[in-house]
Amino acid sequence: MAKDHEDDDLSLHDLIEGPTRDLTSARAAALARIQARPASDDHEVDGTSGDPQAGQPHDQRGEGAGPEGRRRVELERLPASGALYRRALLGVVPGVGGRRGADVPGLELAVGGVAVDQRHLADYDRVCGFRLTDRLPATYLHVLGFPLSLRLMTSPGFPIPLTGVVHVANRITVRRPVEVGETVDFHTYAENLRPHERGRQLDVVLIGSIGGEEVWRGVSTYLGKERASGGGPRRDRGDRPAPPAFSAQWRVTPQVGTDYARVSGDHNPIHTSKLGARLFGFPRPIAHGMWSKARCLAALEPRLPEAYTVDVAFKLPVPLPSTVAFSASPVGDGWDFALHSARDGRPHLTGSVR
């Protein structure tokens, strides 16, 4: 029987400062070979050019003025994620990638009439542990609209590179339940670029509306690593608090990485491939952070109100395979919850429902 290697030390310091390596052209080429599917939607939307026709994709419907002075670009359909990941890999190859912007792009991307495939929803529910119902989990709408955000994050001049970016937090607000049969209009933009001790952070906002009414909002916070002279001090792990008593344990197998990639369209090879993980310095693949959030939310599903906000901070990655411990405690009308390593109590995420 293969050893699980649960004692591999993947600390937050290592995640942000360590194994997320700078990609050389050789590493980028190796990762591009892992992405085997041919590109089918590899057209650019340029958020930095003053020319409205610059970088206009073939699936672009029209454009106008969005709020906060952003240029709003309407797409005819959701972009294909695979081509966007390949673009991100090519973007780190010297002489191929463009110059990074000094600020978030003044661009808002939108797509209307996104329908839910009931079989895909059922597949997602099974992978993440939700009940099979016609109501969309809060995290499913993130998956549904994420290709639009991915297009934004791979646009020329986006201030942080997608390759090697660290997803540090995600907040989802559900205004009302969304059911199968409803079509959703999405729009996305980036804001709040700010310095961080390890680089720069920004927020990518994704909003879902039905009939002109906002029903769902997701805010993902990403960290783009940048080299700092001398580096920062290592965190003192002795200050880590003891984990709370757990209410459930889950075995997270490598199949979770491949299954979630299939249902989410997020085929980042650090989640599905030993080679892809090693190219970024991880000894083996790690679980998608949004799978971890979805699995925790599924455990709370019977207790969720009609409208709520679920906020999560991602801590240490979940190596595949491993065993994790879930804990939850009521706080007023909501919940606090967490996911830790069942072996040594290292935190994987902390969250709240309010």
List each language-model region with its residue ranges.
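N-terminal intrinsically disordered, low-complexity tails
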Residues: 7-46, 51, 55
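Cationic, low-complexity basic patches in intrinsically disordered or flexible, solvent-exposed regions
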Residues: 57, 61
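HotDog/MaoC-like acyl-thioester-processing domains
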Residues: 62-95, 99-100, 148-150, 168-252, ...
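Hot-dog-fold acyl-thioester-processing enzymes
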Residues: 66-167, 229-303
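Hydrophobic residues on conserved beta-strands that form the core of alpha/beta folds
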Residues: 111, 217, 307-309
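Short, structured beta-strand/loop micro-motifs enriched in basic residues and often containing a Trp
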Residues: 165-171, 306-310
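Catalytic-pocket segment enriched in acidic/His residues
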Residues: 271, 275-333, 339-344
